[in-house]
Amino acid sequence: MILKQQDITQQKPFVDASVTTTWTIDLHYPEKPACACDAFQSVAKQLRISPYPIPYRCLYSRNIDNLMMAGRNISVTHVALGTVRVQRTTGMMGEVLGMAASLCKKHDCTPREVYRQHLDELIAIMTEGVPTRRVTPSGRTIGASE
């Protein structure tokens, strides 16, 4: 799935809503060539939005079975990228993909199969959030000590 400007501005609901972002659609364009200003100057155009969720389906590859992405390489259009590209949002993508990776390991499945077969479980983990202490699949305890 490719997230588009219309999905954002029309607040399209997604069953696999994963990361919520509130950043404006923030697009930067170079100054007109006739500008006598610094060559690296640009013009920013910002379109305010309401908070919206990025679908989990934007965070894995459509043609490479075991590839997940967090950051500027997710499945979005140029305009939609203007709002998902900030560090706080990309960091949250990483958290969601860590959760999805744990389900891939647990169920011996691909990221796409997490969406198709284990979405309720992923949503439950996302709702719980990132714990400070957890037991890994190998039985090791990680995180803050009590």
Please identify what each model-predicted range represents.
Residues 1-146:
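Flavin (FAD/FMN)-binding glycine-rich loop and adjacent Rossmann-like elements that form
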